[in-house]
UniProtKB/Swiss-Prot annotation:
Disulfide bonds join C49-C52. Keywords: Disulfide bond, Electron transport, Redox-active center, Transport. One of its GO terms (cellular component) is cytosol. This is Thioredoxin-like protein Clot. GO terms for molecular function: protein-disulfide reductase [NAD(P)H] activity. Belongs to the thioredoxin family. Probable thiol-disulfide oxidoreductase that may participate in various redox reactions. InterPro entries: Thioredoxin-like_sf (IPR036249), TXNDC17-like (IPR045108), TXNDC17_dom (IPR010357). Residues 1-136 form the Thioredoxin domain. The active site is at C49 (nucleophile), C52 (nucleophile). It comes from the Eukaryota.
Length: 139
Protein backbone atom coordinates (compact mmCIF):
# COMPACT_ATOMS: atom_id res chain seq x y z
CA UNK A 1 0.00 0.00 0.00
CA UNK A 2 1.02 3.65 0.08
CA UNK A 3 2.57 6.03 2.58
CA UNK A 4 1.18 9.57 2.59
CA UNK A 5 3.60 11.99 4.27
CA UNK A 6 2.24 15.32 5.43
CA UNK A 7 4.40 18.01 7.05
CA UNK A 8 3.15 20.37 9.76
CA UNK A 9 4.51 23.11 11.96
CA UNK A 10 3.16 24.29 15.29
CA UNK A 11 1.22 26.98 13.39
CA UNK A 12 -0.66 24.66 11.02
CA UNK A 13 -0.61 21.38 12.97
CA UNK A 14 -4.20 21.43 14.23
CA UNK A 15 -5.64 21.81 10.73
CA UNK A 16 -3.62 18.84 9.42
CA UNK A 17 -4.26 16.75 12.53
CA UNK A 18 -8.03 17.36 12.45
CA UNK A 19 -8.22 16.49 8.76
CA UNK A 20 -6.08 13.34 8.89
CA UNK A 21 -6.75 11.99 12.37
CA UNK A 22 -10.43 12.70 12.99
CA UNK A 23 -11.70 10.39 15.74
CA UNK A 24 -14.48 8.83 13.67
CA UNK A 25 -12.21 8.27 10.70
CA UNK A 26 -10.74 4.92 11.82
CA UNK A 27 -13.20 2.97 9.70
CA UNK A 28 -11.26 3.72 6.54
CA UNK A 29 -8.53 1.40 7.81
CA UNK A 30 -5.47 3.61 7.51
CA UNK A 31 -2.50 3.26 9.83
CA UNK A 32 -2.10 6.74 11.34
CA UNK A 33 1.30 7.80 12.62
CA UNK A 34 2.57 11.04 14.15
CA UNK A 35 6.27 11.77 14.04
CA UNK A 36 7.47 14.74 16.07
CA UNK A 37 10.83 16.05 14.82
CA UNK A 38 13.24 18.95 15.17
CA UNK A 39 13.22 21.57 12.43
CA UNK A 40 15.66 21.18 9.54
CA UNK A 41 18.45 23.53 8.60
CA UNK A 42 17.77 24.56 4.99
CA UNK A 43 21.45 24.56 4.02
CA UNK A 44 22.34 21.12 5.38
CA UNK A 45 18.93 19.39 5.33
CA UNK A 46 19.82 18.08 8.80
CA UNK A 47 17.96 18.84 12.00
CA UNK A 48 19.51 20.43 15.08
CA UNK A 49 18.67 17.17 16.89
CA UNK A 50 21.24 14.36 16.48
CA UNK A 51 18.70 11.73 17.61
CA UNK A 52 16.31 12.84 14.85
CA UNK A 53 19.05 12.60 12.23
CA UNK A 54 19.78 9.01 13.28
CA UNK A 55 16.18 7.85 13.75
CA UNK A 56 14.48 9.40 10.71
CA UNK A 57 15.91 7.06 8.05
CA UNK A 58 15.16 4.03 10.24
CA UNK A 59 11.58 5.16 10.82
CA UNK A 60 10.94 5.90 7.13
CA UNK A 61 12.42 2.54 6.12
CA UNK A 62 10.26 0.60 8.58
CA UNK A 63 7.11 2.56 7.68
CA UNK A 64 7.67 1.91 3.96
CA UNK A 65 8.32 -1.79 4.64
CA UNK A 66 5.17 -2.06 6.73
CA UNK A 67 3.07 -0.37 4.05
CA UNK A 68 4.32 -2.84 1.44
CA UNK A 69 3.40 -5.77 3.66
CA UNK A 70 -0.05 -4.52 4.67
CA UNK A 71 -3.36 -4.06 3.01
CA UNK A 72 -3.69 -0.65 4.62
CA UNK A 73 -2.43 2.74 3.60
CA UNK A 74 -0.25 4.66 6.04
CA UNK A 75 -0.60 8.34 6.91
CA UNK A 76 2.53 9.85 8.46
CA UNK A 77 2.07 13.34 9.88
CA UNK A 78 5.52 14.83 10.44
CA UNK A 79 5.22 17.57 13.03
CA UNK A 80 8.19 19.90 13.30
CA UNK A 81 8.65 21.30 16.83
CA UNK A 82 10.62 24.40 15.84
CA UNK A 83 14.16 25.52 16.44
CA UNK A 84 16.05 24.46 19.56
CA UNK A 85 15.11 27.47 21.75
CA UNK A 86 11.44 27.09 20.79
CA UNK A 87 11.48 23.38 21.62
CA UNK A 88 13.30 23.93 24.93
CA UNK A 89 10.53 26.23 26.18
CA UNK A 90 8.58 24.30 28.87
CA UNK A 91 5.41 25.98 27.56
CA UNK A 92 5.86 24.52 24.05
CA UNK A 93 2.34 23.59 22.88
CA UNK A 94 3.15 19.90 22.31
CA UNK A 95 4.86 19.56 25.68
CA UNK A 96 1.70 20.87 27.36
CA UNK A 97 -0.91 19.20 25.12
CA UNK A 98 -2.46 16.28 27.07
CA UNK A 99 -2.83 14.29 23.84
CA UNK A 100 0.94 14.19 23.31
CA UNK A 101 2.88 15.39 26.40
CA UNK A 102 6.13 15.36 24.47
CA UNK A 103 9.35 15.20 26.41
CA UNK A 104 11.77 14.63 23.53
CA UNK A 105 12.21 14.36 19.80
CA UNK A 106 11.94 12.26 17.82
CA UNK A 107 8.70 10.78 19.13
CA UNK A 108 6.63 8.36 17.04
CA UNK A 109 2.97 7.81 17.96
CA UNK A 110 0.43 5.43 16.45
CA UNK A 111 -3.00 7.06 16.64
CA UNK A 112 -6.18 4.96 16.90
CA UNK A 113 -9.72 5.67 18.03
CA UNK A 114 -8.91 9.26 18.92
CA UNK A 115 -5.91 8.53 21.15
CA UNK A 116 -2.31 7.38 21.21
CA UNK A 117 -2.33 3.59 20.89
CA UNK A 118 1.45 3.08 20.84
CA UNK A 119 4.38 5.39 21.42
CA UNK A 120 8.13 5.40 20.91
CA UNK A 121 10.31 8.07 22.49
CA UNK A 122 13.60 9.63 21.54
CA UNK A 123 15.67 7.02 23.37
CA UNK A 124 14.43 4.13 21.19
CA UNK A 125 13.23 5.73 17.95
CA UNK A 126 16.35 4.58 16.10
CA UNK A 127 15.74 0.87 16.85
CA UNK A 128 14.09 -0.89 13.90
CA UNK A 129 12.38 -3.56 16.01
CA UNK A 130 10.85 -0.91 18.30
CA UNK A 131 9.65 1.10 15.30
CA UNK A 132 8.14 -2.08 13.83
CA UNK A 133 6.25 -2.71 17.08
CA UNK A 134 4.63 0.74 16.93
CA UNK A 135 3.90 0.68 13.21
CA UNK A 136 2.53 -2.86 13.21
CA UNK A 137 0.57 -2.71 16.48
CA UNK A 138 -2.83 -4.35 16.14
CA UNK A 139 -5.68 -1.91 15.81
Amino acid sequence: MTVEKVDATVADFDAHFDKLFAAGDDAEGKVKLLLFLADRDASSNQTWCPDCNVAEPVIYDRVEAAAKGKEKDVVLLRAYVGDKPTWRDPAHPWRADPRFRLTGVPTLIRWENGAAAARLGDDEAHLADKVDAVVNAAN
